């Protein structure tokens, strides 16, 4: 279980202090699929980075399975089973996709077939990618899918995905949502997905709308989705439909 208690994040700007995250408290039970959504600049990514340890909060406490992890490093959190997928994943010149999957799996010895299976789950033809370097020759969407495959290979207990649909074509997007659904059905991990996409939002056990650094709405899909649509129709583009996705 993940517990955020009165999390705040403040930065200094030329105009003075600015609160990016304002006293957010939320508990996420094990094996839930949570979607964080809301307007751009509302604080979703910052909150996710705080959970992973990429950003240190200026106030509050983070508990994971009852342990205070607020001061732990990224590496220490990763060892506890927390994984993070970036909006814009890094590239690794000289490291092949196969190498990256083996590194992600850690002590688990992945067979070539297992590596191929992870790539297939994110909509990539394994034979075309396994021996390619994760460098500038790959598109942003390709690197994004490879990163998601490495997260799957880690078998983390808490998986955080920041806009996993970004730069991904419709066919691969469909495969990706199927993968999220399967992980959720298996009940092996808690997922936090930052997304504006209707199809991903509707997978959620709970939707959390974050705006202006605060939780604006939280509840089931049936409760919150109509509010998102109302905001959208009212001129606040909280939700974007992925054209062609059904």
Where are the regions a protein language model picked out?
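The feature captures the beta-strand-to-loop junction immediately N-terminal to the Walker
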Residues: 37-39
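Helix-to-loop junction immediately C-terminal to a conserved catalytic motif
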Residues: 52
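ABC ATPase NBD coupling module
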Residues: 68-83, 228
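Conserved ABC transporter NBD signature motif
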Residues: 60-67, 114
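Walker B catalytic motif
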Residues: 163-164, 171
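Q-loop/switch helix immediately C-terminal to the Walker
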Residues: 88, 94-111
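Conserved structural motif at the start of ABC-family nucleotide-binding domains
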Residues: 2, 19-23
């Amino acid at each position: 279980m993940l517990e955020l208690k009165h999390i705040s994040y403040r930065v200094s700007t030329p105009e003075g202090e600015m609160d990016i995250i304002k006293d957010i408290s939320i508990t996420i039970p094990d094996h839930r699929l949570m979607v964080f959504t809301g307007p751009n600049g509302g604080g979703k990514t910052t909150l996710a980075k705080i959970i992973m340890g990429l950003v240190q909060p200026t106030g509050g406490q983070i508990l994971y399975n009852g342990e205070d992890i607020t001061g732990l490093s990224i590496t220490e959190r990763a060892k506890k089973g927390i994984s993070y997928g970036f909006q814009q994943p890094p590239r690794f010149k000289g490291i092949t996709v196969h190498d990256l999957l083996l590194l992600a799996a850690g002590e688990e010895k992945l067979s070539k077939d297992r590596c191929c299976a992870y790539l297939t789950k994110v909509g990539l033809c394994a034979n075309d990618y396994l021996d390619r370097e994760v460098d500038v020759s790959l598109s942003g969407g390709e690197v994004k899918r490879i990163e998601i495959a490495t997260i799957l290979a880690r078998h983390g207990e808490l998986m955080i995905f920041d806009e996993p649909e970004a730069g991904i074509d419709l066919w691969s997007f469909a495969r990706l949502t199927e993968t999220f659904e399967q992980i959720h059905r298996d009940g092996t991990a808690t997922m936090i997905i930052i997304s504006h996409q209707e199809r991903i939002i509707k997978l959620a056990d709970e939707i959390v709308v974050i705006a202006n650094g605060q939780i604006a709405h939280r509840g089931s899909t049936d409760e919150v989705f109509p509010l998102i649509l109302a905001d959208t129709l009212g001129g606040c583009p909280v939700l974007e439909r992925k054209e062609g996705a059904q």
